[in-house]
């Protein structure tokens, strides 16, 4: 059974979406022709029963904020003097409606006030050192300061160490050698700190210490030729172009000399004025030998062009013998060709035709075919003779070129 053609083609059809409309027929908007023209003026081309212009506002039209919350009228409820609700029933033997008298103790209140005063003020007593247990030994102070410098992030461990070492004697904890090493390290650190402070006072002012201003990002200074920062800047620049660098250097020298001549800048160096011929700048003058040496390398060895030498006596004798042998061979070939030319003077041409006459008999047909075969055979022989003759002429020309000097017209 073949495939049935669909009643509706989905690709070539239009689909519509039905949306419910809760409005009544009398409330629906019916656009007029003027309304549609005004709507198309603002780029709205929808042809439906909706007023799109109701969302349009003028540029200078003030905005008005509408309150989205519903207003609720305030209502007052009048109650009688006596309570409208009866008191709550007693719960587990306790009377909730009755209020017991509060207990007040003056000593407790004064103690609480003193505690709150101490917490709020944060002031210390005049004799807080004696209250804390007196001054500590210098060795214990040095040890604690070094330990806190190493573990500044772990405050809880520092507190535990302080409590642990308060109960022990200092002589038992530290020997004389350990205390001496701590004092030496502290002395070295103090020397470094003093040198750093002197360097800061000498190199920088108080105004130059700290973060730079908002727009002051220019940092001046001089770099050494072999400084690592200078090499890094060169590498960041990337591969340099030799021609571009040369042109940039020339431009810098020209601008600097111009400013020196105008007196804008002063230069302590002394320069010597040298006159240069203008013709040498435009085109360099080279002779053949000096110019050829500019491109000499391991692959190219330019030299002066020399005239070819003449043949030696031995070479001339060999050349004469070769010419005589070629002449003898050419004479023999010419004799053979003259004899062959006598036979080939008459060209073989076809006198028969492959066309069959209208009233041809079988005997005439067989004779005609034999004549055609004979003519084709003679034609093949003629072609072979022509091919052989052209090959011989080509060999003669090749032999004639032997010993000739190749020359090119000037």
Swiss-Prot record:
Note down the stretches annotated as region Disordered.
142-165, 325-378
Where would one find coiled-coil regions in this protein?
363-389
Q: Which Pfam families match?
A: LTV
Q: Where is the composition biased (Basic and acidic residues)?
A: 357-366
Q: Which InterPro entries match?
A: Ltv1
User: Is this entry keyworded rRNA-binding?
Assistant: no
Which GO biological-process labels does this protein carry? ribosomal small subunit biogenesis; ribosomal small subunit export from nucleus
Q: What domain of life does the UniProt record list for this protein's source?
A: Eukaryota
- Which residue stretches does the UniProt record annotate as biased composition, category Acidic residues? 151-165, 325-345
Q: How far does the signal peptide extend, from start to end residue?
A: none
What keywords appear on the UniProt entry?
Coiled coil
Entry's transmembrane regions: none
Q: Which GO terms describe its cellular component?
A: cytosol; nucleus; preribosome, small subunit precursor
List all Basic residues biased stretches.
367-378
Reply yes or no: does the keyword Coiled coil apply: yes
The family note in this entry says: Belongs to the LTV1 family.
PANTHER family for this protein: LOW-TEMPERATURE VIABILITY PROTEIN LTV1-RELATED, PROTEIN LTV1 HOMOLOG
Protein's name according to its UniProt entry: Protein LTV1 homolog
Q: Which organism is it from?
A: Caenorhabditis elegans
